[in-house]
């Protein structure tokens, strides 16, 4: 029966690039992305799974270069694949955000009957080569936002965290560093740009025309949806903020 489980949809992109809004909208048109998720529609255990391995390599989500260098090697890629595969076999449900309650069991059972599913977690952008070995045929939805806007948003969030009393995250108060970080994620995601299973979405275009962009994405993901579902999903996407011309 498990042979009928579809390959997942991986929603990737740099932090603060619109991946949350995109994932929420796709969920509303039928993409199953788990039930035990944080406010950004991410499974916490998947975040930890990724971050623990990043730190093994001397990196972190905000310092991906050591990991990216490691996974380029045959040894590094195979080690990463083994790490992810072992953990998924042990704890598929919790890693992908499913509870051990009747609804969670029902949601997981639907996967065995071909329900479209996937997940959103920005670090997946870095880990995608390994995930696609574990789930051959997986589809990539790569959400891209203007790099300057994404970098500014990362820095602004960091400064808010510090103002609230959180310890500083290395280098994230530096706008130039944030720009380099966004570019590293962008380059990592574009490794798959020549694949038929890759779909790039410019977040500003999604904000400008949610119905058309979401319909295209939903079709790419193999979703079946109603006009009402599409309208509801489109309404969930906030329009871009209009900046004052005096600023």
Across the structure, where does each feature detected by a protein language model lie?
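PAPS-dependent sulfotransferase catalytic core
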Residues: 1-99, 164-167, 172-178, 230-247
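PAPS-dependent sulfotransferase catalytic domain
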Residues: 105-228, 246
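Short, surface-exposed acidic
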Residues: 35-38, 222-233
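Residue-level marker of structural boundaries
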Residues: 31, 159-160, 239
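Active-site micro-motifs of SAM-dependent methyltransferase domains
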Residues: 28, 33, 149, 208, ...
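Residue-level detector of flexible, active-site-proximal loop/helix-junction positions
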Residues: 40, 147, 205-207, 232, ...
């Amino acid at each position: 029966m498990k042979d009928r489980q579809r390959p997942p949809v991986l929603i990737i992109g740099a932090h603060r690039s619109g991946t949350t809004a995109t994932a929420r909208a796709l969920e509303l048109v039928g993409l199953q992305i788990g039930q035990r998720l944080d406010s950004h529609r991410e499974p916490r255990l998947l975040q930890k799974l990724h971050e623990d391995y990043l730190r093994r390599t001397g990196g972190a989500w905000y310092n991906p270069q050591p990991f990216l260098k490691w996974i380029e090697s045959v040894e590094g890629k195979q080690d990463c694949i083994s790490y992810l595969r072992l953990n998924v076999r042990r704890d598929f449900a919790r890693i992908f955000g499913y509870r051990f309650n009747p609804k969670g069991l029902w949601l997981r059972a639907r996967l065995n009957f071909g329900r479209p599913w996937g997940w959103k977690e920005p670090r997946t952008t870095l880990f995608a080569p390994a995930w696609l070995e574990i789930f051959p045929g997986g589809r990539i939805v790569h959400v891209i936002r203007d790099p300057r806007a994404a970098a500014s948003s990362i820095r602004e969030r960091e400064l808010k965290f510090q103002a609230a009393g959180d310890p500083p995250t290395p280098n994230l108060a530096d706008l130039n560093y944030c720009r380099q970080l966004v570019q590293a994620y962008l380059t990592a995601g574009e490794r798959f740009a020549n694949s038929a299973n890759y779909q790039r979405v410019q977040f500003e275009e999604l904000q400008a025309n949610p119905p058309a962009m979401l319909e295209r994405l939903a079709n790419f993901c193999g979703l079946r949806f109603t006009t009402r579902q599409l309208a509801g999903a489109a309404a969930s996407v906030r329009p871009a903020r209009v900046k004052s011309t005096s600023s």
